[in-house]
Amino acid sequence: SAPDPTSDVGVAGAQQFILEKTPAWVNKYGKDTAFFCTNDAQTEPLLKQVAKYGAIFVEPDLPSPLMGYPGAFGIDLTKEAGNWPAIVKKVEAAVVKAGGKGRMGTWAYSYGWSTTCALAEYGKRIVEGKAKLYNLKDLWKCYDKFTPGAAWNGAPYFDVAKGIKNKKLTLVYQDTYVFGKGYMKATDEAVPEKYLTIK
């Protein structure tokens, strides 16, 4: 647990806490500990310390090479703006140089950007009769159009309490790109049905 940046310590205090505590956490739990945060103000200091002390950072909470990495490693992406493969290449070089090779990742294309583009395309194709509503293969083709090289997967939301799938809500994910290694191929893995019954 860490201080809330909206509390009296502010953003600076919350960031300082992460900078100071991460080395102790790595020492206590080991370098094979995966760190994660949902507080955007704490992402940059966490990335810095994870790289410096050799721990693992799978991906940001809103996965994107723009989420925390440029600020944490002083990366200027002015020339690469709008070019996701070039952005990933430059961020990857900085992460590897900082010591995060094979231990830090992200989605190669911003979650927000790619989902906005894909859903607009999906709606367009449905109206044109080129895609069917609730057809995941058609949806993945729309994601693929805007995210070459990245794989996508997902499934309709399953309400465990009611025991039903809700086809109107699809949980999607892009394969994680690990800097210095490439894609994890996590989207190739099938989630066993038995996990739909865990309460």
Predicted regions and their residues:
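A residue-level marker of the well-folded mature domains of exported/periplasmic proteins
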Residues: 1-199
